[in-house]
From Swiss-Prot:
Family annotation (SMART domains): EFG_C (SM00838), EFG_IV (SM00889)
Residue stretches making up the tr-type G domain: 9-283
Protein name: Elongation factor G
Cellular localisation: Cytoplasm
Gene: fusA
Gene Ontology process terms (BP): ribosome disassembly
Amino acid sequence: MKERLYPIEKIRNIGIVAHIDAGKTTTTERILFYTGTKHKLGNVDEGTTETDWMEQEKERGITITSAATSAFWKDHRINIIDTPGHVDFTVEVERSLRVLDGAIAVFDAQVGVEPQSETVWRQADRYRVPRIAFMNKMDKIGANFFNAIQTMKDKLGANPIALQVPIGSEAEFEGVVDLLTMEALYWTDENGQIIEKRSIPSNLIDFCESKREDLIAAVAEVDENIMELYIEEEEIPVDKLKEAIRTSTIQSKIVPVLCGSAFKNKGVQPLLDAVIDYLPSPLDMPPVKAFDGTTGEFVKDILPFEDGDFFALAFKIMADPFIGKLTFARVYSGTLNKGSYVVNTTKNKTERVSRLVFLHADKREEVDYIRAGDIVGLIGLKDTSTGDTLSDKECNLVLEKLEFPEPVISVSIEPETKDDEAKLGKALNALTEEDPSLRSYVDHDTGETILSGMGELHLEIIIDRIKREYKVNVKVGQPRVAYKETIKLPSEAEGKYIRQTGGRGQYGHVKLRVEPLPLNSEKEFEFVDKIVGGVIPREYIPAIENGVKESMQDGVLLGYPMVAIRVEVFDGSYHEVDSSEMAFKIAASMAFKDAIKKAKPVLLEPVMKVDVTTPEEYMGDIIADLSSRRGRIESFENVGGTNTRVVHAQVPLSELFGYATIMRSLSQGRATSSIQFSHYEEVPEQVTQKLLSRE
């Protein structure tokens, strides 16, 4: 077997996650610069960053897709996935976290934890991703390292441990004190490549000694070996302390915190050291679980050994203008050579991988083989989708699936010419394959093509890509809300479908009971067979369930999909000769529609979690405006010692179209907002009446 350049214990698969403006992409850029991966510093404001390579990202200065990039530091290979911080793109974050081993959470040292940081943090908790934190923007007015750390405790319930003390802050920020070695590090040149080690400034010695005490006490709380030395008041060797920090970080017991200013080129090299020292290699992570593809039951653990069977998870698909379809995959075990065949065990299809590439934003490096621990691009797969499992042998094993949220907002799009029509279909196929939170379908009533996604910005960027990348001219309709329907009361009804038209007839007779299920729970539908004594033969029960499921796609009020309903089939009858699956399916559909009409059907609307960050003087106007949009104000908070306030509210999506523009005008462009889906709730009666009267 070929020697691998970087043994698996020297690989780090990490993500960089943060709120939209915490400086995450700049931090990634500096990492690439100091690791020698790129030779010139990139800046987001100038559109010269390496990882923001889509046109829309360069224009908007926000990261939309997770760009995969490799960097090399102190004999280690670091595979970095730069993830978007905007809530409309949480699907990108979700699928990146699924395949990562560790993450750097970047925060703005002036404000600490912001709304989107909470969302991303919870996602990382769900996938048990070990983290280190970087308090960025220490040069910013109002930056306060220890206040920002406190917000991690208060808002995230995290256990952050400061490994450094900043030397100065705001314009006076010069460097950091390393609390493990008790050395002061100063960045003395403009590009931040020269680091001088000096003794700690005299005015900081006492403070740093007390903070080092805090650090040791905090590590002792989570590590028995350090606790023993601590109790005996023995000197704790730095390497032992590092080892304990590493173990506790990998077990997610602590979050080591560092600080710096990526934009001013200070603090990035110690962050890279921390990635190597404290974040896990693929060997440190719990094994990935494989399940039976049919029953969903756990079968075995997949261990990260190169000589095992090949298993990988496709976590992202991209349409590349030069090579066609590119599949990003995380290899969990085994080895694969280019030109090999793989089995897509999710779809039970065999495909050939023609080429293998390591990715560097939109550049690629071709390789002959890939191994356990790699994050890689596969070229040549035509039928593989996001979330599919790939193996080198036929088996019925699949890795844990990726879950994606339902879209909440839609627009109609229509091609301007006949020529555009064919191109639009192709564009939509490619884009929906690339982004599982995007759906497109044809509305049978109107014949319109509908595009659905996670928010206004999400759809705006997709439409921009349709026009720019796929050269399709489209007209776009007004945004629409993805309403749903449900019921409030239990009821019963029967459906009889009898047809006699010469020869064999049709006969199906069903009695159903419906009742509401709790809203916003994981169960959106429950079907229960309560037939006794064979009044309806077993073989017709699936047809009854299908009849109900199909009817649920088209609610009785406004034709929206129905959710949160339990259906029980409890009686009926059949005919020896004339009964068929078709007849029972139709009878079930009739009974269901009838039962729903008697069960007090209601409309449901998506409600969004809205967080507005605004200077205090505009707070009154912002609150009044949110209230006028049927918003419920939940709380306010101050942003660490500044006159900035954050308003937290719940507002129906239907009231938020164009909100960003209104909010900017209310605050003279100084407020920012974060809007993300929260839950569905019942539409008030007067609003329902308005919607019904429009139909």
